Structure formats: structure tokens, C-alpha cells
Regions:
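Hydrophobic alpha-helical segments within soluble ligand-binding/sensing domains
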Residues: 74, 129-155, 167-168, 196-200, ...
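Short beta-strand elements in bilobed, periplasmic/extracellular small-molecule ligand-binding domains
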Residues: 55-67, 154-157, 178-196
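Short, solvent-exposed amphipathic alpha-helices that sit
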Residues: 42-57, 136-143, 165-184, 202, ...
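Flexible loop/hinge segments that line or gate small-molecule binding clefts
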Residues: 96-135, 139, 154, 160, ...
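Hinge/cleft segment of the Venus flytrap/periplasmic-binding protein
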Residues: 158, 162, 166, 177, ...
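Short, low-complexity disordered leader/linker segments with a strong preference
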Residues: 1-30, 55, 82, 104-111, ...
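Extracytoplasmic "Venus flytrap"
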Residues: 30-49, 53-57, 61-80, 84, ...
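Hydrophobic alpha-helical
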Residues: 79-108, 174, 192-253
Length: 319
């Protein structure tokens, strides 16, 4: 009799298991990260943070977005997330004005949204998490002046695209400090289009057109390695001070070999992890982050601190 009861109970549990799994899947939160560059090295660092948060906090994460910067495609992906009734959305303000309406749609659907890296000031969002771009530029400019040691700065800038808000603000931060120096000259601003080959060709043309250039500032991750490649090929290593952005592998290698002077780091891991953490906490408790605008921090990385700078960047308890 006891064996029969045990057998029946085992069969009931076996039959119930699929339903329990379905119920758990239905209860699992779904958070969508709409990135501006789905496979770009620096955004893959954000994905690493996002995936780590998913593992730690138990939500299902979707990583979506265009392969090249395209605000319209990002808007479409946000609309898809809204239609799928995602529990939360993370995105970046590539074209803030154009993205306001879709943020309002998310709000109307009851979906909390966190903006990272560059804000959408007029749009409804739970919070913003990103580098203060003008502060980053100003800090970078001070480091460049230290390296120039009195030489007059003849500066060229490279951004991803000219209408990319965060890039413009970073350049303005550099300009606000460098323009105070005697002999400062802003030679040009060129685009990388978020493409390494395009960046290389642009730097080649730039150094040919402006042989007086002694400072090359990148506010797009691929632009720094592209500049280092061209400087080496054109024999300009000892003439041009290269300031890169982000700590992708090529840039770190170029600092180690002395081609690139420094890079301005942004904590993209934190942007992926903490943005998701805020959404989960808000969904569970209704409590929003204490501040609407949050600085994810920045640091100048040179040969002096290259071996130690990243120790705390992936530790939430250190943020």
C-alpha cells in the first residue's frame, strides 16, 4: 500500500514539473537592453555587466540593437520591447529629441526605463547612469597639458558621428580647458562612423592635411586604436599625443607600447549591471534610485596606473 502511494506521489510530481517550470518562467522578469552598437567592444563590456546582473538577480535579459549607430532602429527595438510587455528597458539617448515619444510610450505601458551613457533629459525615465561627458573632457584635457609640458596644443578630434550628443559634450569639455592655453588651435573634428577602417582613413587624411597636429583626441572607442596605427605607420609616434577613450584591449596595448599616451575610462560594466539592478529593485519594491542623474565615474589611465585601475570597476560594493 505504501509503495503504491509513493508511486502515485512520484507520478504527480513528475507530471507537475513542466507546469512548475512554465510558471517559474512566466514569473521571471524580462529586461531588455537596447544598445546603440550590438557588437562593439566597449558595449560588450556593458553586456558583461548586464549578463552578470541577470545571473545574480535572476531575470531574463535580452541584448538587442543595431550594428551601426541608428536612432531609428533603436526606437523600433524599444517599441518591440513594449509590445512584448517587457518588465524593464535600458537604452541610450543617441538622438534624445527623437527618442522622447517612445519613452512616453513605455511610461504609458507601465514599463520602467533606465537611460545610460547619454541622457534623454525631456523623456520620462526611472534614472540616468552615465559618465559626465564635459567633466571627462576637462579631466582629459588637464592630463594632455601635463604631457605637452608647455607646448602649444594643435588639436584634432574624432567622434563617432557629429550629431552624437555625448561626443559633442566630451569635446566641449576638452575645449573648455585646452582653449585657455596660449597657442591653442582647433584644427578639425572628423567622424569614425563607429568603423575602424573609416577611422584609419580619416586619421591618415587628417595628419596629411594638418602636419602641425600634435594632439589627437578620440571620443569614440575605435578612434584611439585607429590613430595609434596611423601614427606608427606615418612615423609620428614622438610628435602626437594620443588621448583615447575606453579601455578596450587595443587601446591598453597601445598605452603599454607607448604609442598612446592615455585613455579616459568609462565604467561600462557598471552601466550594464547597476541599471539592471535598479530596474529589478523598482519592480520588486517600487523604490526608485535616490537620484535621477547618476555619474558612473571616469579615470585617466596611463602607463603609471594601467596595471591597477580596473580592480574596482567590476565590484558593485565599490561603486
Amino acid at each position: 500500500m505504501k509503495k503504491g502511494i509513493a508511486l502515485i506521489l512520484a507520478m504527480v510530481l513528475l507530471l507537475a514539473a513542466p507546469a512548475m517550470c512554465v510558471a517559474q518562467a512566466e514569473q521571471q522578469k524580462h529586461i531588455v537592453f537596447v544598445t546603440p552598437l550590438i557588437a562593439h567592444p566597449v558595449w560588450l563590456i556593458a553586456k558583461e555587466g548586464f549578463d552578470a546582473a541577470a545571473a545574480d538577480l535572476g531575470f531574463r535579459g535580452s541584448w538587442v540593437g543595431p550594428s551601426t549607430i541608428d536612432a531609428n532602429e533603436m526606437i523600433k527595438q524599444i517599441e518591440v520591447a513594449i509590445a512584448e510587455k517587457a518588465d524593464g528597458i535600458i537604452t541610450q539617448g543617441i538622438n534624445p529629441e527623437a527618442m522622447v515619444p517612445v519613452l512616453k510610450k513605455a511610461e504609458e505601458a507601465g514599463i520602467p526605463l533606465v537611460v545610460v551613457n547619454s541622457d534623454i533629459p525631456e523623456g520620462p525615465r526611472l534614472a540616468y547612469l552615465g559618465t559626465n561627458p564635459t567633466n571627462l573632457g576637462a579631466i582629459g584635457a588637464e592630463a594632455i597639458l601635463s604631457k605637452l609640458d608647455g607646448a602649444e596644443p594643435k588639436v584634432a578630434y574624432m567622434c563617432a558621428v557629429l550629431d552624437y550628443q555625448i561626443g559633442r559634450e566630451m569635446i566641449e569639455g576638452y575645449r573648455s580647458v585646452l582653449s585657455q592655453e596660449e597657442g591653442y588651435e582647433e584644427l578639425t573634428i572628423v567622424e569614425s562612423k563607429s568603423d575602424m577602417l573609416t577611422a584609419v582613413q580619416a586619421w591618415e587624411n587628417l595628419f596629411t592635411t594638418y602636419p602641425e597636429c600634435n594632439v589627437a583626441i578620440s571620443v569614440a572607442a575605435e578612434a584611439g586604436p585607429a590613430c595609434a596605427k596611423v601614427v606608427n605607420e606615418m612615423g609620428l609616434k614622438d610628435k602626437v599625443v594620443i588621448m583615447a577613450i575606453d579601455d578596450i584591449e587595443e587601446t591598453i596595448d597601445n598605452i603599454k607600447d607607448g604609442t598612446t599616451y592615455a585613455t579616459m575610462t568609462q565604467n561600462f560594466f557598471r552601466k550594464g549591471y547597476e541599471a539592471a539592478q535598479w530596474l529589478v529593485e523598482y519592480i520588486d519594491t517600487g523604490v526608485a534610485p535616490a537620484e535621477l542623474l547618476n555619474d558612473s565615474g571616469t579615470m585617466v589611465v596611463t602607463l603609471d596606473n594601467i596595471e591597477v585601475y580596473s580592480e574596482d570597476m567590476k565590484k558593485p560594493e565599490k561603486w
